[in-house]
C-alpha cells in the first residue's frame, strides 16, 4: 500500500484555509472583494463578537444562478478568469477561486443569492465544508454570505485569535480602506447591532471627515498627475497629521489595496525633514497602471504586487509627491482653517518664496505665488540623496557683524520681490495691509517666540527652531561646496575629549573641516580649535564642539542618519539661539529674512514646526464676530 495518499477535499480545504483565512478580517476581505466584483453599489457589513460569532456581507450585485452558487464553494472555481494569460488583463479583485471553499471548511457557512430576474432566492448551508441544506427562500436581488463560529472545528486557530478589540480593529481598518477605494458604493458597517457608519453619498472628503474627525479633510493636499505608464491621484496630509504608525497610509493599484515598501519609503523621503522622528505622513493614493505591467499573484492575501518596472514607478511617484509637499505652506494653523488645497484659492496656502535682504517686508508678510520647481530638480534630489548637487541653491552666509547674516536675493526672485513690493499697499481698506511707510509689526514673546502681523492675521515663529533651520541649510550648503567658510580665532581654544568623544571626532573630522572648523591635534585626545564657522558664537567654541559630538552620537544611535546630515543637524541644534535669549529688532528682522530664504521654512531639521499662523477669520470666529 503506498504511503502517499490523496487528501480528502475537506482536509485540503482546511489546510488551504490556513493561508487564505488567518483571522475574521481575512473573511471580510475575501467576501468584500466578491461583492465588489459582482457589481454591487450597496454593501453592508455585519459583525458580531469581533467576527468570531458572525461575519455577514450583504450586497445588491448580480447574484448567482444555482449552478454558479454550487460551484462558487468548490476549490479553484471562479468566474474571474479562464486562462493564466487572463492575469495580464485582470480587472477584478478576486481570481483564485478558493476563498469560499476555504471559509466554508472552517465555519458554519450560509450563502443566499438571487439574480434580478429570478422569482426567489436560493439558500445553501455548509458545516465544515460539507453541504447540509439547500432551499428556496424569499430575498432581495444580490448575495448575502454569513460566516458563523469561525474556526469552530480548528480550535488551535481559534485559540490564537487576539482580543476582540484587536480583531475588530483589523476589520474596521479593512472596511474603511475599501470604502475609501470605492466611494461610488454605499457602505454600511454594523458591529454588535450598532451602526458605525452608513455612507449614502460618494463624497470622499465627507468619508475622511467621518473616519478621522470633522475638519480632517481641510488639512489634505490633492495630488494628481499621469503619463503613458502611470497615473497618480489622491490626497496626502500636512505634517500636522503625521502618525506614529503607517496604518493611515493607503496605496491602491487599480483600486486594489496593497502594501509596498518602495512606495512607503519614497513617500517618507518626499516629506524628509518635515516629519518628527518615527512619524509617518497620511496618504490616500491611487495608482493606475496597465494590468499587464503589474503582477498581483505574488502574495497569499493579494496584499503585495510586483511591477514590471519598479524604477519607472518610483521615478514618477517620488517627484509628484515631492512637488506637492514643496509647493505647499505647511505652517500649522492655531485653529482649523479653510481647505488647504482648493483651486483658485491657494495663494494663501502656497507658502513663502525665498527672500533676502529687506525681503521679509515684501515676502514674509504677503501672500506670494507658488515656487516653480521642476520634476527634474525634484527627481535629482531623490536620485542623488540628501547632499546631491541638484538641490536648489541655499544663500551663502555673509559676514559675522550681525548674529544672523542676511542672504543675498537670488536674481531669479527679484521680479517676485518687486511685484510684491509694488502691490504691498494696494489691498482694500481693512484688509490688514500695513500703511505705506510703516514697518511690519514684530514682537518677541517671553524671549522665545516672534509674533508678526501679516496680511491675513498673525504669524508666530519659534526663534530657536527658526535659527536651527537657517543654520542647518547653511551647513549643508557649505559641506556640499567643499569651500570652508571659517573665521580664525585670535586665541585658539583647547578641547580635551573623553575616549568615546575622540572616536566620534575621528569619524567626522574631515566634515568638520568642510563645515568651517580649523582644528589641530594637540597631544592625546586633545585638539586646538583655531577657526570656526562664522555662525559660532564667540566664547562658545569648545562647548559647541563637545555638544555637537554628543548630539551626533545620539542621532547616530537613535536615527541612523547619513553622516553629513547628522553633522549638519547636530551643528544647527547646538549652535542655534536658545529660548530665553532676547533679540533686538534688527536681529528679529534678520532672522525672519534668513528663515524665508531657506528651502523649508516651516519645520526644523528634526520635523518640529517653525511657524504657526492664525487668520483674522479665526480670530473673528473666536470673538463671536460674523
UniProtKB/Swiss-Prot annotation:
Pfam families: DNA_mis_repair, HATPase_c_3, MutL_C
HAMAP family attached to this UniProt entry: DNA_mis_repair (MF_00149)
GO cellular component: mismatch repair complex
Cystine crosslinks: none
Biological source species: Chlorobium luteolum (strain DSM 273 / BCRC 81028 / 2530) (Pelodictyon luteolum)
CDD domains: HATPase_MutL-MLH-PMS-like, MutL_Trans
One of the record's GO molecular function terms: mismatched DNA binding
Keywords, in A-Z order: DNA damage, DNA repair
Matches recorded under InterPro entries: DNA_mismatch_repair_CS, DNA_mismatch_repair_MutL, DNA_mismatch_S5_2-like, HATPase_C_sf, MutL/Mlh/PMS, MutL/Mlh/Pms-like, MutL_C, MutL_C_dimsub
UniProt-listed GO biological process terms: mismatch repair
SMART domains in the record: DNA_mis_repair (SM01340), MutL_C (SM00853)
Gene3D superfamilies recorded: 3.30.230.10, Histidine kinase-like ATPase, C-terminal domain, MutL, C-terminal domain, dimerisation subdomain, MutL, C-terminal domain, regulatory subdomain
Keyword DNA repair: yes
Protein name (record): DNA mismatch repair protein MutL
Described purpose of this protein according to its UniProt entry: This protein is involved in the repair of mismatches in DNA. It is required for dam-dependent methyl-directed DNA mismatch repair. May act as a 'molecular matchmaker', a protein that promotes the formation of a stable complex between two or more DNA-binding proteins in an ATP-dependent manner without itself being part of a final effector complex.
Family that this chain belongs to: Belongs to the DNA mismatch repair MutL/HexB family.
Protein encoded by which gene: mutL
DNA repair listed as a keyword: yes
Amino acid at each position: 500500500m503506498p504511503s502517499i495518499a490523496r487528501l480528502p477535499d475537506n482536509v485540503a480545504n482546511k489546510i488551504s484555509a490556513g493561508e487564505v483565512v488567518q483571522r475574521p478580517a481575512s473573511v471580510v476581505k475575501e467576501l468584500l472583494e466578491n461583492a465588489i466584483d459582482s457589481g454591487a453599489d450597496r454593501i453592508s457589513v455585519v459583525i458580531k463578537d469581533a467576527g468570531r460569532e458572525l461575519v455577514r456581507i450583504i450586497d445588491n450585485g448580480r447574484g448567482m444562478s444555482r449552478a454558479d452558487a454550487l460551484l462558487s464553494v468548490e476549490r479553484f472555481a471562479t468566474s474571474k478568469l479562464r486562462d493564466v494569460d487572463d492575469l495580464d488583463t485582470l480587472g477584478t479583485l478576486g481570481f483564485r477561486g478558493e476563498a469560499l471553499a476555504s471559509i466554508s471548511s472552517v465555519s458554519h457557512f450560509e450563502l443566499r443569492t438571487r439574480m434580478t430576474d429570478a422569482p426567489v432566492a436560493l439558500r445553501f448551508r455548509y458545516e465544515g465544508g460539507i453541504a447540509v441544506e439547500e432551499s428556496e427562500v424569499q430575498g432581495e436581488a444580490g448575495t448575502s454570505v454569513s460566516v458563523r463560529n469561525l474556526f469552530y472545528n480548528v480550535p488551535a486557530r481559534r485559540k490564537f485569535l487576539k482580543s476582540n478589540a484587536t480583531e475588530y480593529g483589523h476589520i474596521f481598518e479593512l472596511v474603511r480602506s475599501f470604502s475609501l477605494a470605492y466611494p461610488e458604493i454605499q457602505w454600511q458597517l454594523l458591529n454588535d447591532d450598532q451602526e458605525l457608519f452608513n455612507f449614502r453619498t460618494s463624497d470622499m472628503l465627507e468619508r475622511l471627515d467621518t473616519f478621522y474627525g470633522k475638519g480632517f479633510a481641510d488639512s489634505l493636499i490633492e495630488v494628481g498627475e499621469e503619463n503613458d505608464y502611470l497615473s497618480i491621484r489622491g490626497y496626502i496630509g500636512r505634517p500636522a497629521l503625521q502618525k506614529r504608525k503607517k496604518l493611515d497610509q493607503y496605496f491602491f493599484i487599480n483600486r486594489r489595496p496593497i502594501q509596498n515598501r518602495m512606495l512607503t519609503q519614497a513617500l517618507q523621503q518626499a516629506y524628509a525633514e518635515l516629519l518628527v522622528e518615527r512619524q509617518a505622513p497620511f496618504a490616500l493614493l491611487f495608482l493606475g497602471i496597465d494590468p499587464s505591467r503589474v503582477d498581483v499573484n505574488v502574495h497569499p492575501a493579494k496584499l503585495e504586487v510586483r511591477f514590471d518596472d519598479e524604477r519607472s514607478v518610483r521615478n514618477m511617484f517620488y517627484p509628484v509627491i515631492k512637488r506637492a509637499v514643496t509647493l505647499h505652506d505647511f505652517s500649522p494653523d492655531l485653529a482649523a482653517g479653510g481647505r488647504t488645497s482648493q483651486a483658485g484659492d491657494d495663494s494663501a496656502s502656497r507658502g513663502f518664496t525665498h527672500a533676502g535682504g529687506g525681503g521679509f517686508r515684501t515676502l514674509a508678510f504677503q501672500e506670494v505665488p507658488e515656487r516653480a520647481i521642476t520634476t527634474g530638480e525634484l527627481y535629482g534630489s531623490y536620485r542623488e540623496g540628501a547632499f546631491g548637487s541638484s538641490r536648489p541653491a541655499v544663500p551663502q552666509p555673509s559676514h559675522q557683524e550681525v548674529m544672523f547674516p542676511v542672504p543675498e536675493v537670488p536674481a531669479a526672485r527679484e521680479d517676485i520681490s518687486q511685484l510684491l513690493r509694488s502691490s504691498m499697499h494696494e489691498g482694500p481698506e481693512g484688509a490688514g495691509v500695513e500703511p505705506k511707510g510703516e514697518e511690519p509689526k514684530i514682537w518677541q514673546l517671553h524671549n522665545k517666540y516672534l509674533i508678526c502681523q501679516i496680511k491675513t492675521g498673525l504669524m508666530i515663529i519659534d526663534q530657536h527652531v527658526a535659527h536651527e533651520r537657517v543654520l542647518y541649510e547653511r551647513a549643508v550648503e557649505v559641506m556640499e561646496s567643499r569651500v570652508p567658510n571659517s573665521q580664525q580665532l585670535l586665541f585658539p581654544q583647547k578641547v580635551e575629549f573623553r575616549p568615546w568623544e575622540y572616536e566620534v571626532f575621528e569619524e567626522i573630522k574631515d566634515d568638520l573641516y568642510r563645515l568651517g572648523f580649523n582644528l589641530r591635534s594637540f597631544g592625546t585626545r586633545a585638539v586646538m580649535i583655531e577657526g570656526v564657522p562664522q555662525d559660532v558664537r564667540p566664547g562658545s567654541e569648545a562647548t559647541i564642539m563637545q555638544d555637537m559630538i554628543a548630539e551626533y552620537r545620539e542621532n547616530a544611535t537613535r536615527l541612523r542618519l547619513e553622516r553629513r546630515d547628522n553633522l549638519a543637524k547636530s551643528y544647527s541644534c547646538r549652535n542655534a539661539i536658545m529660548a530665553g535669549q532676547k533679540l533686538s529688532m534688527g536681529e528679529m528682522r534678520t532672522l525672519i529674512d534668513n528663515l524665508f530664504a531657506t528651502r523649508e521654512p516651516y519645520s526644523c531639521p528634526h520635523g518640529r514646526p517653525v511657524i504657526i499662523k492664525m487668520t483674522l477669520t479665526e480670530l473673528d470666529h473666536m470673538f463671536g464676530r460674523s
